[in-house]
Amino acid sequence: MDRDTKLAFRLRGSHSRRTDDIDDDVIVFKTPNAVYREENSPIQSPVQPILSSPKLANSFEFPITTNNVNAQDRHEHGYQPLDAEDYPMIDSENKSLISESPQNVRNDEDLTTRYNFDDIPIRQLSSSITSVTTIDVLSSLFINLFENDLIPQALKDFNKSDDDQFRKLLYKLDLRLFQTISDQMTRDLKDILDINVSNNELCYQLKQVLARKEDLNQQIISVRNEIQELKAGKDWHDLQNEQAKLNDKVKLNKRLNDLTSTLLGKYEGDRKIMSQDSEDDSIRDDSNILDIAHFVDLMDPYNGLLKKINKINENLSNELQPSL
């Protein structure tokens, strides 16, 4: 590869683009104009349209010199991968990044299992309106930057009346880079915005599900309370029946007690009457008893009245016999 082409590859690095503070809002893109002047441009060829997709074999030809024979050979035989020595910007660090082993690649499954969102409230899981608005604003800013500033400037530089094909190729490369970066950045920001919006929608649905769960729990608690009330109502009804039976028994017992007291009152009254009658009867009984005892004494065959009468009769008989 010739020196000029290698220098062009170097200029694609970070030092080829910088902002000059000429105006506050005007972004100036440094092109190879500062390096290549028209009087010493190494390549001259007709102007090529911007919208075409030229191949390396048809875009321009390298002048065959002793310094660029290797580049012309690659150009004639089509595209071939260049050697590492043709890319001075690739160092050992970049090689290590390119040849990174698959074991160092981030594993999404390990990354997802590393986080636990169980203890995080929903309000922290949802994206704030500030974040969503910031993503939208950044997307608008980048679109405005590329679509209204960088891409039109690159197109304007490409369409200049200039016969330097190498410089036009750099302008075209800039234009393609700006378009690619703009499209990819727009898609990425749109994906990020969609992810945040979807996250908020899922958080809202999760809130609705949790609210519905809470309502169902309250309904379950209400149903359980009603069931307990029904069970308690049945028990209360049974208790009321038992209480009614007990009250009936108490009333019956009271009536029995009243009847018993009434009967006992009559018995006491009768007993008093009978006690008075028994006293009179006792007097009569005593007299009767005395009469019987007197009768028994009188009828005693040894000491009774008859024995006395007989004894008197015998004494009288004995007294009368001497007189006769």
Curated annotation (Swiss-Prot):
One family name in Pfam for this protein: CENPU
Coiled coil regions, renumbered to chain: 199-263
Keywords, alphabetical: Cell cycle, Cell division, Centromere, Chromosome, Coiled coil, Kinetochore, Meiosis, Mitosis, Nucleus, Phosphoprotein
Transmembrane intervals: none
Residues where Phosphoserine is found: S41, S45, S53, S59, S101
Single GO biological process annotation from the record: attachment of spindle microtubules to kinetochore
Any one GO cellular component localisation term in the record: kinetochore
Localization, UniProt: Nucleus; Chromosome, Centromere, Kinetochore
Subunit structure: Component of the heterotetrameric kinetochore subcomplex COMA, which consists of AME1, CTF19, MCM21 and OKP1. The COMA subcomplex is part of a larger constitutive centromere-associated network (CCAN) (also known as central kinetochore CTF19 complex in yeast), which is composed of at least AME1, CHL4, CNN1, CTF3, CTF19, IML3, MCM16, MCM21, MCM22, MHF1, MHF2, MIF2, NKP1, NKP2, OKP1 and WIP1. COMA binds the centromeric nucleosome-binding protein MIF2, and to the outer kinetochore MIND subcomplex, probably via AME1. AME1 interacts directly with OKP1 and an NKP1-NKP2 dimer.
Further remark: Present with 1630 molecules/cell in log phase SD medium.
Family: Belongs to the CENP-U/AME1 family.
Biological role stated in the UniProt entry: Component of the kinetochore, a multiprotein complex that assembles on centromeric DNA and attaches chromosomes to spindle microtubules, mediating chromosome segregation and sister chromatid segregation during meiosis and mitosis. Component of the inner kinetochore COMA complex, which connects centromere-associated proteins and the outer kinetochore. COMA interacts with other inner kinetochore proteins to form the inner kinetochore constitutive centromere-associated network (CCAN), which serves as a structural platform for outer kinetochore assembly.
Record protein name field: Inner kinetochore subunit AME1
Organism: Saccharomyces cerevisiae (strain ATCC 204508 / S288c) (Baker's yeast)
Upper classification of the organism: Eukaryota, Fungi, Dikarya, Ascomycota, Saccharomycotina
